[in-house]
Design a protein with these regions (language model features):
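Haloarchaeal acidic low-complexity proteome signature biased toward cell-envelope/secretome components but also
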Residues: 1-177
């Protein structure tokens, strides 16, 4: 198995790339797609995500250098797979965990206007909160009206964002429970 220079043991470098994932939807799309479908080649990322080839190579290299992607084959074309992300931030008593599911939700801002508009209105913290309700909605433990009340948004906006995030919540739901 091929080994690459990674960011393991360099938490601040990994923090920087996680910040980049949060701020760069295309980078988040590459990570999220590789996490769900990996191992993948750069060519597959280009074809399946419609990302320009130069961008795909650059972003794969950035993720690999930070230790979030690993080259898993020595043969050409190289295949890459992900390392799990789990970064918990606590600010002023509010805790948020950056997980593969949240990265996948952020990635949707690049391809889903409803998610993009929601982030414009409520920010990434609002998206993280809405994603938690999307998980509960997939588990059928919450309605859009309850989510609307608790997120302090209209029932229509709650329904729209929960529907937009449902594929992410369904893909990352714990099948055991």
């Amino acid at each position: 198995m091929a080994k690459s220079a990674t960011g393991r043991g360099r938490p601040l470098q990994q923090l920087q790339i996680v910040a980049d994932l949060i701020e760069t939807p295309t980078l988040a799309r590459i990570y999220a797609h590789t996490e769900r479908e990996g191992p993948v080649t750069v060519g597959e990322l280009v074809d399946e995500l419609g990302v320009p080839q130069g961008t795909a190579y650059d972003y794969v290299q950035r993720l690999e250098t930070a230790g979030l992607l690993d080259q898993v084959t020595e043969s050409r074309p190289s295949e890459y797979d992900t390392e799990a992300i789990s970064l918990t931030l606590s600010v002023d008593g509010t805790t948020t965990t950056v997980s593969p599911a949240l990265v996948a939700a952020i990635a949707r801002t690049d391809t889903d206007d409803d998610v993009d508009v929601y982030v414009e209105r409520h920010g990434l913290d609002g998206l993280a909160a809405a994603l938690e309700y999307a998980f509960e909605r997939v588990d059928e433990t919450v309605s859009h009206r309850i989510a609307a009340r608790e997120l302090d948004i209209s029932p229509l906006e709650a329904e729209i964002v929960l529907q937009a995030l449902e594929p992410v919540a369904a893909a990352y739901s714990d099948p055991s429970g």
